[in-house]
C-alpha cells in the first residue's frame, strides 16, 4: 500500500492508495501546534493505524507547505512552526522503521496529475496552482524535479518582468511586498488573493474573485477589462515558465482553476510571449481536486 499524507497548518490527512493510485481509505486529524514530539507521534499513529487496517507496512510520502532541504535534512515550513527547521524525515523514519519521503505540496499536486491515466502520455508535466497562493511543480518522466536544495518549483517567487510592469502601468503598477522578503513576486498577482488585490487597486472596488468572475460573465465592462488584463498578465508570466521548462502539458489547480474562461483565453494569449517555434502545450483543469496532495505524496514511491 502507498500512504500519502497532506501536512497542513490545521490538519493532517492520511490516505491509502493501491498501485493504481485508487484511494482505499483516509483519516484526518488536527495538527499539533506546540509540541514537536506530539506532532511526530500524530503522524506515527496515523501510519500505524493504516498498517494495522491493511495488514502490511505501507510506504510513507508527505506533502508539506515548504520543502525539506536536501543538503541539511531540515524542514523549511515556516507556517508549521512546530516542525520548522526540524529533521522530520530522519525522525519519522526512525520511529516508523522505514524510509519516509517528502515534497512540497505543489509538487505533490503536479505529480498526482502526471500520474493520472489520461496524462501518463506526457513525459513532462507542469502543475500550476492558482489558489490562496501561486505555485507550481514540474514532473519529468513520472518523478518530481526538486532541484539541488529542494526549492525547484517555487514559481510563486519569480518576479514581474518588463512586460508585466509595462502592462500594469510602470510607475503606477501595484507593487506588493511578499512574505519571502522580496517585492513583486507572482504569488501576489496570479493567486486568487492577487486577483482580488489587483482588482481593488486597478478598479477601486473591493470584490471577491467569485463576484468579479460573475460580473465578467454578465459582460460588466469593468470586470471584462480586468479579466482581459489578468489573462495577459498570466500569459506573460506563464510564458516565461513555459520557455524555461517546455512542458508537454500544463495542469491548473486551486480556486481560480475553476474559472473556465482561462482555458479558452490563455492558449490564445500565450504565443506572443513564447519563442517563435515554441508550441503552446495543452492546458487542463486538475482532475483530482482536494485529493491531489495526498495522492501525489503517495506517488512519491511510484516510478514509471
Swiss-Prot record:
<keyword id="KW-0547">Nucleotide-binding</keyword>
<keyword id="KW-0119">Carbohydrate metabolism</keyword>
<dbReference type="GO" id="GO:0008270">
    <property type="term" value="F:zinc ion binding"/>
</dbReference>
<dbReference type="GO" id="GO:0045127">
    <property type="term" value="F:N-acetylglucosamine kinase activity"/>
</dbReference>
<comment type="function">
    <text>Catalyzes the phosphorylation of N-acetyl-D-glucosamine (GlcNAc) derived from cell-wall degradation, yielding GlcNAc-6-P.</text>
</comment>
<dbReference type="InterPro" id="IPR023505">
    <property type="entry name" value="N-acetyl-D-glucosamine_kinase"/>
</dbReference>
<dbReference type="Pfam" id="PF00480">
    <property type="entry name" value="ROK"/>
</dbReference>
<feature type="binding site">
    <location>
        <position position="178"/>
    </location>
    <ligand>
        <name>Zn(2+)</name>
    </ligand>
</feature>
<keyword id="KW-0808">Transferase</keyword>
<feature type="binding site">
    <location>
        <begin position="133"/>
        <end position="140"/>
    </location>
    <ligand>
        <name>ATP</name>
    </ligand>
</feature>
<keyword id="KW-0418">Kinase</keyword>
<keyword id="KW-0067">ATP-binding</keyword>
<feature type="binding site">
    <location>
        <position position="180"/>
    </location>
    <ligand>
        <name>Zn(2+)</name>
    </ligand>
</feature>
<feature type="binding site">
    <location>
        <begin position="4"/>
        <end position="11"/>
    </location>
    <ligand>
        <name>ATP</name>
    </ligand>
</feature>
<keyword id="KW-0479">Metal-binding</keyword>
<protein>
    <recommendedName>
        <fullName>N-acetyl-D-glucosamine kinase</fullName>
        <ecNumber>2.7.1.59</ecNumber>
    </recommendedName>
</protein>
<feature type="binding site">
    <location>
        <position position="185"/>
    </location>
    <ligand>
        <name>Zn(2+)</name>
    </ligand>
</feature>
<dbReference type="GO" id="GO:0005524">
    <property type="term" value="F:ATP binding"/>
</dbReference>
<dbReference type="InterPro" id="IPR000600">
    <property type="entry name" value="ROK"/>
</dbReference>
<feature type="binding site">
    <location>
        <position position="157"/>
    </location>
    <ligand>
        <name>Zn(2+)</name>
    </ligand>
</feature>
<keyword id="KW-0862">Zinc</keyword>
<dbReference type="InterPro" id="IPR049874">
    <property type="entry name" value="ROK_cs"/>
</dbReference>
<comment type="pathway">
    <text>Cell wall biogenesis; peptidoglycan recycling.</text>
</comment>
<comment type="similarity">
    <text>Belongs to the ROK (NagC/XylR) family. NagK subfamily.</text>
</comment>
<dbReference type="InterPro" id="IPR043129">
    <property type="entry name" value="ATPase_NBD"/>
</dbReference>
<dbReference type="GO" id="GO:0006044">
    <property type="term" value="P:N-acetylglucosamine metabolic process"/>
</dbReference>
<dbReference type="GO" id="GO:0009254">
    <property type="term" value="P:peptidoglycan turnover"/>
</dbReference>
